[in-house]
């Protein structure tokens, strides 16, 4: 569901910008698709009232382990092209066992490339939505249903704090299923008065 794959993305962003010059535009991407000219044009359309979050989970030797099929050189060229035209870029780094040793190096690279921000993200992938319990690893799958990279949980300090609450929630509610049934869900898009387009094309 990467926005840059869609042939309508640039036209869509341009439409929003023409309709409302004060609207803040943003998107998340793995940055591996399209050419540098596409990214330069996106930066010009967005201007300073917008940003792109580039999901780079590691460096040249590790990013592809989670971002399957994504070419690192393309990621670097595309993000650099976006920044070169004044685009505001954020680097978001999901922490796994295989890349946790590269956080500081990636942070320095982001600074050198003039990213506006570098953020680490503690993933919630080490929780089984089927068994409703924590797990030590996450098996990656490709589009053909074949197993790919097995992702291992990072060190304790990099584990999503929400995963540590599992036992407390079970003790309080009896089960995770019951917790889901009685917990209120707050929509971030409503709270921030945003329009959010999902990978399936749903608009909220």
Task: Please describe what each predicted stretch is.
Residues 8, 37-38:
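Short acidic active-site motifs
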Residues 30-33, 59:
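Short beta-strand->alpha-helix junction loop in the catalytic core
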Residues 25-29, 91-93:
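Conserved hydrophobic beta-strand within the GNAT/NAT acetyltransferase core sheet
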Residues 21-23:
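His-Asp phosphorelay/catalytic-motif detector in bacterial-type signaling
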Residues 3-4:
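A short, conserved beta-strand element in the Rossmann-like catalytic core
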Residues 10, 14, 19, 41-204:
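Radical SAM enzyme [4Fe-4S]-AdoMet core and its adjacent flexible, acidic
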């Amino acid at each position: 569901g990467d926005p840059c794959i869609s042939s309508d993305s640039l036209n869509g962003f341009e439409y929003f910008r023409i309709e409302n010059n004060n609207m803040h535009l943003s998107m998340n991407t793995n940055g591996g698709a399209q050419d540098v000219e596409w990214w330069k044009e996106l930066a010009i359309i967005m201007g300073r009232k917008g940003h792109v979050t580039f999901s780079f989970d590691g460096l040249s030797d590790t990013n592809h382990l989670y971002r399957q099929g994504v070419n690192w050189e393309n990621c670097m060229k595309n993000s650099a092209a976006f920044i070169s035209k004044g685009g505001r870029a954020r680097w978001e780094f999901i922490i796994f066992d295989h890349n946790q040793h590269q956080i500081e190096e990636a942070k320095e690279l982001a600074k050198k490339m003039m990213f506006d921000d570098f953020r680490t993200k503690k993933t919630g992938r080490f929780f089984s939505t089927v068994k409703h319990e924590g797990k030590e690893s996450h098996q990656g799958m490709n589009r053909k249903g074949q197993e790919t990279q097995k992702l291992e949980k990072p060190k304790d300090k990099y584990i999503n704090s929400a995963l540590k609450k599992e036992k407390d929630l079970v003790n309080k509610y009896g089960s995770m299923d019951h917790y889901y049934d009685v917990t209120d869900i707050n929509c971030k898009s409503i709270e921030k008065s945003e329009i959010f387009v999902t990978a399936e094309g749903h608009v909220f």
